[in-house]
Amino acid sequence: MLVPKRVKHRREFRGKMRGEAKGGKEVAFGEYGLQATTSHWITNRQIEAARIAMTRYMKRGGKVWIKIFPHKSYTAKAIGVRMGSGKGAPEGWVAPVKRGKIMFEIADVPEEVAREALRLASHKLPVKTKFVKREAE
């Protein structure tokens, strides 16, 4: 599971998810990629579930790059606790993903296999996605 080794602040502000991703909008390492078309928080568990779905379909062939990292903590109060009395305890880790960001990349597999593997991975994620190919240099 992806988690930061150490953080400066345990509890973070939620922040805004406006606009497009600044960088990481092109396929950089692999041949095919999975690009977000909407913005959302993606948890470390969702990233792991997507990774497992891809690698199992590819039968551990090919190469996978995970281009997002859950560096932001999110908090939650216990069920039945009244409002007030401070911010809740850290609950987990999320990667804020804006539209346009390439989240996963795949190489060394045929296009049909890559397309299906990324389709399976997209079902594990809370964002709408599209399959993209590396542009020829």
Swiss-Prot record:
GO terms for cellular component: cytosolic large ribosomal subunit. It holds the Pfam family Ribosomal_L16. Keywords: Ribonucleoprotein, Ribosomal protein, RNA-binding, rRNA-binding, tRNA-binding. One of its GO terms (molecular function) is structural constituent of ribosome. Binds 23S rRNA and is also seen to make contacts with the A and possibly P site tRNAs. PANTHER family: 50S/60S RIBOSOMAL PROTEIN L16, LARGE RIBOSOMAL SUBUNIT PROTEIN UL16M. Part of the 50S ribosomal subunit. HAMAP family: Ribosomal_uL16. This is Large ribosomal subunit protein uL16. It comes from Streptococcus mutans serotype c (strain ATCC 700610 / UA159).
